[in-house]
């Protein structure tokens, strides 16, 4: 084991995971709010947080975006953006009843799962949706066939979940889960329901998979892994878990560099750094500066994939992407 501890004389260094940070769906959603503010002027209303990041939401609020929990808090007729996490048909119906001018910033990879729910439920399937109850994405997805969807929160739940009829059964998932934990959940579902069908393609999205793969690469080499991301960001929280499961001696999540407890760096030679899919790169740069001041001036990039996916903007904003 080439792990180096106290007094080894090995230079302190940072392993910077790549890919990290913004995914295509987040980029599109944030630009949608910015463009809507440019085009319509403030206020522009957003149902829920546009993406699960404290910094992004705060900076858009300063520019005139108003974040609300439900559409009934929005004045009739106002410009309204649905967040990247997607909405149920019931929310769309409420928005239409209020005459809201809707811009739908749902990530296309979430919409794909919505379409799977619609297709499988129409074909008479019962759907086991692997995901976290109460998460906005899961609420939106399950809302497309509420009486045909059961949510499976964990591998343990797969062992006990009560399924009404099992002749036509399929599993789907939230886009931001731990790949390994989801495989374990599916394995256990299959033990109980051998004929359960798989989704037509991966529901866990490319960005979630890529960020987890990059963390797996740096984790075994790191004394500490720092994940930049917010507490309500499912994919960021998963990165901490994945780091710990793959050999990181310690792992923490923080929103801002100044939240880093210097005591965490005690006896630490190698710091792994990554960020969740809704995190602007400036927050990672701030962290690297704080680490440099603490002696971690050497930064090595560890790249496991190249991402070049870009989504076109939501309807109503398309011709103006810059």
Curated annotation (Swiss-Prot):
Top-level EC class as recorded in UniProt: oxidoreductase
Domain of life, per lineage: Bacteria
Gene3D superfamilies in the record: 3.40.50.11270, 4-hydroxy-3-methylbut-2-enyl diphosphate reductase, catalytic domain (3.40.1010.20)
Pathway membership: Isoprenoid biosynthesis; dimethylallyl diphosphate biosynthesis; dimethylallyl diphosphate from (2E)-4-hydroxy-3-methylbutenyl diphosphate: step 1/1; Isoprenoid biosynthesis; isopentenyl diphosphate biosynthesis via DXP pathway; isopentenyl diphosphate from 1-deoxy-D-xylulose 5-phosphate: step 6/6
Cofactor binding description: Binds 1 [4Fe-4S] cluster per subunit.
Reactions listed under catalytic activity: isopentenyl diphosphate + 2 oxidized [2Fe-2S]-[ferredoxin] + H2O = (2E)-4-hydroxy-3-methylbut-2-enyl diphosphate + 2 reduced [2Fe-2S]-[ferredoxin] + 2 H(+); dimethylallyl diphosphate + 2 oxidized [2Fe-2S]-[ferredoxin] + H2O = (2E)-4-hydroxy-3-methylbut-2-enyl diphosphate + 2 reduced [2Fe-2S]-[ferredoxin] + 2 H(+)
Residues engaged in binding isopentenyl diphosphate: 52, 85, 135, 233-235, 278
Function: Catalyzes the conversion of 1-hydroxy-2-methyl-2-(E)-butenyl 4-diphosphate (HMBPP) into a mixture of isopentenyl diphosphate (IPP) and dimethylallyl diphosphate (DMAPP). Acts in the terminal step of the DOXP/MEP pathway for isoprenoid precursor biosynthesis.
Protein name: 4-hydroxy-3-methylbut-2-enyl diphosphate reductase
Binding annotation for [4Fe-4S] cluster: 23, 107, 205
Leader sequence residues: none
Enzyme Commission number(s) from the entry: 1.17.7.4
